[in-house]
């Protein structure tokens, strides 16, 4: 897949995901959605978000050590919110930036988010 220049100067790497499309009806992002990955390791999470056919992606992935990886350009519609609505808005994927925070989640003891990771999310 063709790479791109990160939108954020603090993104340390680009791992392009093919799982994205155009924002519907010319929408622009006016909200940010934070998610945690809920997977046992970073490799599995990145594979899930960046492998063709998984129908999942995010604009940014924030690693436990604070590094930020961009996977979808901000101008595109990442597939992170599913069929969703909020405050009367439909198709949240078309009006949001999706940020996946690497964390194993409930099935693996729900560890604390490291301070470097929290600082990176805040800076992003």
What feature does the model see in each segment?
Residues 2-123:
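Active-site-adjacent loop/helix surface patches within enzyme catalytic domains
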């Amino acid at each position: 897949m063709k790479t791109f220049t990160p939108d954020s100067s603090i993104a340390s790497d680009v791992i392009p995901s093919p799982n994205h499309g155009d924002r519907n009806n010319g929408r622009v992002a006016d909200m940010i959605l934070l998610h945690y990955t809920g997977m046992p390791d970073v490799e599995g999470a990145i594979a899930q978000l960046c492998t063709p056919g998984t129908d999942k992606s995010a604009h940014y992935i924030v690693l436990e050590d604070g590094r930020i990886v961009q996977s979808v350009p901000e101008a595109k519609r990442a597939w992170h919110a599913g069929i969703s609505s909020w405050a009367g808005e439909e198709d949240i994927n078309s009006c949001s930036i999706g940020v996946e925070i690497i964390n194993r989640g409930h099935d693996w003891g729900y560890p604390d988010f490291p301070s470097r990771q929290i600082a990176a999310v805040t800076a992003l």
